[in-house]
Amino acid sequence: MRRIAVFDAPSNLGLRPPTATSVPGCAKGPGALRDRGLVERLSARDAGCLTPPRYDPGDWRPGDGVAQASAISLYSVRLADRIEETIDEGEFPLVLGGDCSIIIGAGLAMRRRAQASDERIGLVYVDGHSDFRHQGNASYVGAAAGEGLAIVTGRGQPDLAAIEGRRPYFRDADVVLIGIRTHDGYRMDLEAAGIQALPVPKLRAEGAGRSVQWVRAQLAGCSGYWLHVDVDVLDPAVMPAVDAPDPGGIAYPELELLIGGLVSSPGCLGMQVTVFDPDYDLDGAHAGALTESLLAGLHPLLVSGHPPASATAATPAARRTSDPPITTPQPAVGTV
């Protein structure tokens, strides 16, 4: 079995400022998870941190294209290099973000590998939002984190969507989206593109186990796939510490079953976790719950002979089930 190699990609370049005098806090996400012992309890190799460029949206205005595109592009190349190096060492890269724009670097890495082997590599996109805004369906683009799926499927400005001339990083037919809400504004665009999507109600109706089987069937023609997990796929009642919380999400046990079923396949080449924002988690409770959930979901990857450092590594901590569901949409402060 492959050993997990954890490295941080704490880029917040793909989000707009939450206020006029602050920067997105998701750059602190990897540190919060490390503080909860994630790396040690996975018996993973600590592969360090890939430091992003400075966050500086400057005087960006609607119509200027994607904000901080040059910095995101440069960082994506470095991230792709790091992901490829990790896979080439026979390890499973677990990338701790950071915002969803890190999918550009992961996508570039997968496209390089696919072209080198003349094979197809897919993308499993577990996310509360489709991230499918692009110039063809919106009046303007701006925050790359809200456009990540569009960019990696070739819809976007060349400095992001065609790095090294490799547009697209994933074919539409090789992408499966899980966890979007029924009211997602780009569902019709996904359908028109032929991108398969499994909204939360359908996921619930099928169950996580059957949903994983369905995902694998959709990607049967691919030699492997990359797994993207945006923690805003969770309902805000259990995970409000994100830039754009949206009611109607899944629960932790469902997330654990999805991750476990997807990473247990030898075809899963790596995984990224995005958008957890400790600025909205003042007492650290959500960092703790997320860590426990990731440990449980990643348990199939624990290497024989390297047991988890804690007996609780594969067992989620008890969570409150009495919290009332959040029914009022929260403001999407980061990805607009």
Language-model regions: role of each:
Residues F7, G98, V126-G128, I178, ...:
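Active-site flanking residues adjacent to catalytic metal/cofactor-binding acidic residues
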Residues R155, A161-R181:
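Phosphate/diphosphate-binding glycine-rich loops and adjacent basic-rich segments that engage nucleotide
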